[in-house]
Structures are given as structure tokens and as C-alpha cells.
Regions:
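Vicinal oxygen chelate
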Residues: 2-9, 13-21, 62-131
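Long, continuous compositionally biased terminal/linker segments
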Residues: 6, 55-60
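Core segments of cupin and vicinal oxygen chelate
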Residues: 10, 17-55
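Alpha-helical elements of the RecA-like P-loop NTPase motor core of helicases
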Residues: 27-28, 81, 118
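Acetyl-CoA-dependent GNAT
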Residues: 41, 59-61, 121-125
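Short hydrophobic/aromatic beta-strand element in the GNAT-like acyltransferase core
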Residues: 46, 55, 71, 94, ...
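Short low-complexity, flexible loop/linker segments enriched in glycine and/or proline
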Residues: 53-56, 110-112
Length: 131
């Protein structure tokens, strides 16, 4: 993996995604805790807290694109491609990089312990709202 003199490009730990049975009920719970709903789709929602830098994705029962995971966020799209290529060259099984409908781009992989994680480019200003 990357050494101290070889930065990975990871900006921060950005969001956690959890599976929920009832998206609307979960949104109500988390907005009551002070989170802001910024993306709402039929099968998933995204909420932010604070200055919009920390997020929670609520994955409904019909959401099939990904399962529960945590995500490292990158400041630029190139960083995602660089880490994707580096991990692949090291023999790590990584998914393809996808451009998403919310302006982000990402890929998924498992760490050596079997935990799912996402490497995500987040556009300047954060994930745009569709609400």
C-alpha cells in the first residue's frame, strides 16, 4: 500500500451507508437528530450533518447498486482513478469506476478483512441536492 511519502489522495472519511427497511421512517428519524436530507430517490436517500462534509446513505430494500459500506472521499476525480489503478496493480480486486447521477464517481472494493468500502469523488461544494 501507499507509504508516508506517497499520498493516496484520500481527502477524508466521508460517509457511511446502512441498509434500512423503511426509507421514509429512517429519514424522519435522522432528520429529527439534526441531519439534512440532500438526496431523495425511490430506493435510497442521502443525509448530511454539520457543514455538509459528513454523510449517511440510507439504502432501501430495493436498492441493489451497493450494500452497507463506508466511503473515503476524494477532492478530484483523478484521485479516484489513481487509487483504482494502484490497487488493481497490487492485485486487489476492485470494481469498475462509475459516474453516478448525483455528479459523483466511485468504485467499490473489500478490505483484507472483508469489509466493503467505496472510493468516491465528491464534486466541489459537496453532493448536490435534489430535494
Amino acid at each position: 500500500m501507499a507509504s508516508a511519502d506517497q499520498p493516496t489522495g484520500v481527502d477524508r472519511l466521508g460517509h457511511v451507508a446502512i441498509r434500512v427497511e423503511n426509507v421514509d421512517r429512517a429519514v424522519a428519524f435522522y432528520t429529527d437528530l439534526g441531519m439534512r436530507l440532500v438526496w431523495h430517490a425511490d430506493d435510497w436517500c442521502y443525509l448530511e450533518v454539520g457543514e455538509g462534509r459528513d454523510g449517511l446513505a440510507l439504502l432501501g430494500p430495493n436498492y441493489k447498486a451497493a450494500g452497507p459500506h463506508f466511503a473515503f472521499h476524494f477532492r478530484d476525480r483523478t484521485g479516484v482513478d489513481v487509487i483504482h489503478d494502484r490497487l488493481k496493480a497490487q492485485g486487489v480486486h476492485v470494481g469498475a469506476v462509475h459516474d453516478h447521477r448525483d455528479g459523483t464517481a466511485s468504485f467499490y472494493l473489500k478490505d483484507p478483512e472483508g469489509n466493503w468500502l467505496e472510493m468516491l469523488y465528491e464534486p466541489p461544494g459537496g453532493i448536490p441536492s435534489n430535494c
